[in-house]
C-alpha cells in the first residue's frame, strides 16, 4: 500500500514523513531529533534528479525554519541558514505553493500534515 501511495505522489511537490525502523533510530538520531521519523521527497526537476543520480541521496533542511514562510530566493535562505548550509544552488526566484506534507504511519494510515501544491487522495480521515 505504501509503495502505491509513494508512486502516486512522486516525483513532485510532496514530502512524505515515514517512521524509521527501530534498528535505525540511534544511527539517525541527529536527523530525526527524537521523533523516530524522517521526511523524504523525490523532486521533479530534471537537473536536480540528474545531480542526485550522480551524488546519491541528499540531506537538506526545508527552505525555512519550522513556522516561517519558505525562502523564495538564495538571499532569503541565507538569512535563515547562513553558513549552516554547505551548498546553495541558484534556481531563480521560487514562487508558488509550498510542498504538501503527508505522514504514513506504521499501520499504513496517511495523515495530511500540510496542504500545499499537491492534493493527496489517500489521506485517512481518522488521523
Regions found by a protein language model. Give the residues of each.
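Active-site-adjacent structural elements in enzyme catalytic cores
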Residues: 1-127
Amino acid at each position: 500500500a505504501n509503495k502505491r501511495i509513494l508512486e502516486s505522489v512522486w516525483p513532485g511537490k510532496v514530502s512524505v514523513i515515514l517512521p524509521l525502523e527501530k534498528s535505525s533510530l540511534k544511527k539517525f538520531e541527529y536527523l530525526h531529533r527524537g521523533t523516530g521519523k524522517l521526511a523524504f521527497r523525490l523532486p521533479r526537476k530534471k537537473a536536480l534528479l540528474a545531480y542526485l543520480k550522480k551524488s546519491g541521496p541528499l540531506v537538506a533542511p526545508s527552505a525555512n525554519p519550522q513556522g516561517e514562510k519558505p525562502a523564495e530566493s538564495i538571499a532569503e535562505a541565507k538569512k535563515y541558514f547562513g553558513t549552516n548550509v554547505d551548498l546553495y544552488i541558484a534556481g531563480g526566484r521560487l514562487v508558488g505553493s509550498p510542498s504538501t506534507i503527508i505522514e504514513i504511519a506504521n499501520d499504513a494510515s496517511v495523515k495530511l500534515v500540510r496542504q500545499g501544491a499537491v492534493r493527496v487522495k489517500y489521506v485517512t480521515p481518522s488521523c
